[in-house]
Amino acid sequence: MTHSIPAGDERKTVVVIGGGAGGMLAAGRAAQRGARVILLEKTGQLGQKLLVSGKTRCNLTNSKPLKEFIAMYGSNGRFLYGAFDHFFRDDLLALLERYGVQTKVERGGRIFPASDDARDVAAAFRRYLDDHRVEIRTGVRVTEIMVQDARITGVMSRKDRNSDPVFLFADAVILATGGATWPGTGSTGDGYDMAAALGHTIVPLRPALVPLIVEETALAKSMQGVSLRNVRLNAFQCRADDIDDEKAPTRDTGRGIPGKRPRPPVIESRLGEMMVTHFGIGGPVTLLMSLKIVDALAGGPVSVAIDLKPALDWSQLQNRLQRDFDQHGKRSYRRILAGLLPLKMIEPFIQMTGIPADKPAHQIAATERERIAGLLKSLRFNIRAPLPLSSAIITAGGVSLKEIDSRTMASRLIRGLYFCGEVMDIDADTGGYNLQAAFSTGFLAAESVGN
């Protein structure tokens, strides 16, 4: 075993594990405050996940006000107030501008580099690190964080399995290893094992912002590639057959209505865009609802109902259909559907309603019209599972926030250990929130190390 210990250097030595968004900012800020900083990245390149974020455009942050911003993290959002107080959106944008990155605001408040190129952001952070003389070591895997008497002493690392282990002395370690998604970028969940080995509790990991697999794979395949805009996705804690139609109450009042079952619990309901894939459903609104659906699956069956005409209530849709049938009575059922649905959904709808495709509109009975309306308001799928964690955009779960001081990002168990980014139990919707959390917690961890 070889040692790497600074000789004649009175500065505090900080080892940052992980060269992603939070790790780079943490390393640069700690060095800026006077520490000797060694940044360890197990892949051959810094910022690999940053380079693919936002479809390689890098959705840096969001323009929403602080209160709305915090709400995007759910019940754990309050944990971030301290980090955002030290380093928030304007601070991030000012830092990037200092290194030549201009930004722009797009729909939903999403902020991107003006160049639409994540490489410009990664290059800016690399210049930030170089300016403050951060020692960067790529292709180095940390195998253990060393502790004595509940205090950090350093880390063990090695280049590969055949190389000798190297002990790096450290006064402090910032764990910035990210989550367990996008493993090709180096995010393979190593940090969870390191933290657990030191006694930290790991909140169970689940995929978040992830497409969902349905049981009705043949139906999904028949609609594969269909993109749906301005639809409402409703998720229920029940099998699809147990969802009442649109005429049922929208929520269970505890009383129900005569002749009908109370509507099952609604897990979540969102309006937006989604798509049908060969295995199930994806797209923005699906991703945003996925974590609640994943968590609900642990408690029993989950189904979804797609409202393809959310702007119309049940009676309005019935009237719309009747008007179409009256005005175009000689048109076939297939041609009527062509005015209501994307092309690839027409044949599945014909099969599901059981109405002959060539039946003239004026011959469609009231019961058949109700069947059509029912499908338009509630196209149902049973959810089998999410895609694997490796296919998710972010990881839900991680190091328990109860064991981290939100004022400093310091471990409450081990002196000299700090956390930042996705390794902690923090996750949010898409829109730049997860990157901002990584940047802000990385900055606060570095500030705290300096203190």
Q: Where are the regions that the model predicts?
A:
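Core beta-strand elements of the Rossmann-like FAD/NAD(P) dinucleotide-binding domain
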Residues: 10-12, 161-172, 269-272
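Short hydrophobic core segments
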Residues: 15-17, 155, 167-181, 195-196, ...
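Glycine-rich FAD pyrophosphate-binding loop
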Residues: 31-55
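A glycine-rich dinucleotide-binding beta-alpha-beta segment and adjacent secondary-structure elements
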Residues: 137-140, 144, 347-427
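Conserved beta-strand-loop-beta-strand element in the redox core of flavoprotein oxidoreductases
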Residues: 146-167, 173
